[in-house]
């Protein structure tokens, strides 16, 4: 999150804060590749760190749509502008997630392996409202693309080994009348076809981990909570 929000340096090159969701996805894969080439074992990142960049792209696309309609003499109807913007945004989210999936399985680290990566999908990591809805859009696209799979050298659709997926079950997606139930249904279909994602119960994990919910390291251990490591808002630091 810090590297995406505040920029970072990769191979002596300054990487500034991304100005679109697609760029954020590209930067994420570069960070994963660099980390994987300098350590053993797996690594995890959460889609909630990408969620804020959906609205960055939304505002950028909306501005572009307005400019196009002014140039072509079209009426500036907010409903039409919003509809076009959301359609283009969906396309960008689709492209961004596809970039993550294909770059991670085709990248080779310095030891000749694809990065061992786990993607964490937990809606309650972001505030309720538009950001959570944007995160839901990202999660939905990840599930759909994983259900489709990737083509092998013979052109046959197969299940990629990485990234591994973890989906968290909580009050807003666990019952049929909950807002994000459709994601849980999609996750179940994805599991039936591709054997991912794995599932974490937020309720049980909070009981076992002092109220925290977080991913395992790659596909292995869960960190023991270190009380001295805190985020700016006082919550425990896991990323």
Spans of model-derived segments:
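Conserved catalytic cores of very large enzyme subunits
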Residues: 1-239
């Amino acid at each position: 999150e810090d590297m995406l929000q505040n920029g970072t340096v990769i191979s002596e090159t300054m990487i500034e804060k991304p100005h679109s969701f697609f760029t954020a996805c590209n930067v994420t894969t570069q960070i994963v590749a660099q980390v994987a080439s300098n350590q053993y074992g797996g690594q995890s990142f959460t889609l909630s760190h990408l969620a804020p960049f959906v609205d960055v792209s939304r505002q950028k696309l909306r501005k572009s749509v307005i400019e196009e309609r002014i140039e072509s003499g079209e009426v500036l109807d907010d409903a039409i502008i919003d509809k076009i913007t959301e359609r283009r945004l969906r396309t960008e989210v689709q492209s961004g997630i596809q970039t993550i999936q294909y770059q991670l399985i085709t990248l080779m680290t310095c030891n000749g392996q694809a990065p061992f990566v786990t993607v964490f999908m937990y809606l309650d990591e972001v505030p309720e409202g538009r950001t959570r809805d944007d995160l839901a859009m990202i999660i939905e696209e990840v599930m759909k693309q994983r259900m489709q799979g990737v083509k092998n050298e013979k052109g046959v659709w197969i299940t990629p080994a990485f990234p591994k997926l973890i989906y968290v079950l909580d009050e807003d997606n666990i019952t049929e009348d909950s807002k994000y139930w459709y994601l849980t249904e999609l996750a179940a279909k994805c599991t039936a076809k591709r054997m991912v994602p794995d599932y974490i119960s937020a309720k049980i994990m909070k009981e076992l981990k002092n109220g925290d919910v977080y991913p395992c390291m790659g596909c292995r251990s869960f960190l023991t909570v270190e009380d001295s490591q805190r985020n700016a808002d006082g919550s425990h630091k896991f990323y």
